[in-house]
Amino acid sequence: MMDTTKKRLPLVFTIIILFGLISMFGDIIYESARSANSQYLNLLGINAAKIGLVFGLGEFLGYFLRLVAGILSDKSGKHWIFMFIGYGMLISVPVMGLTLNWNFLFILILMERIGKALRSPAKDTILSKVSEHKVGVGIAFGIQEAVDQIGAFLGPLIFTLVFYVTGKEALNQYQVGYRVLLIPFILLMGFLYYVF
């Protein structure tokens, strides 16, 4: 029994690290957008009241729907489906670089927040089940969060680098920044499929 547990430990740690990388790429996308969205919308001439309304609604949906997603994910047992749909909705961020229509941009911002609500409870459930009897839930979440925070740091740097390379901070540069986020999105979905 002891030998079996020891053999499984490297696999469990690998899964935890992969979950961390998935979260990291998700955070690169999310934090990049978060650092740029308000200024991008401002450059499009959208007033502060509308921007505040969409961000407020997005945050509300992002937290309220976690409860709904958690209940549905537990009742159905389809945690992976919730993860794939939730992370898949991050495609909304790179797509923001393809449109100047503010109505569509608002929908994309809300989509990203809804995606976060769908994936978070499912991801936490899977991670806790994988790690519970092998390494401990606290250690697993600690490792995953540590890797995840790298993404929170790297995300805003993407737009900074785009502005630095082009030498200006204009509408086109914001669109390039959003489009570049397709790369971490593809990597994220690849890692997610691999872990699945």
Region spans (language model):
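Residue-level signature of mid-helix packing/kink "hotspots" within the transmembrane helices
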Residues: 59-67, 153
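Structural signature of the two symmetry-related core transmembrane helices
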Residues: 81-95
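Cytoplasmic helix-loop-helix junction between adjacent transmembrane helices
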Residues: 108-150
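Transmembrane alpha-helix termini and helix-breaking/packing motifs in multi-pass membrane transporters
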Residues: 39, 43, 154-173
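Helix-loop junctions at membrane interfaces in 12-TM secondary transporters
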Residues: 96-109
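Helix-loop boundary and gating motifs at the non-cytosolic
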Residues: 5-62
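Helix-to-loop junctions at the C-terminal end of transmembrane segments
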Residues: 65-77, 163
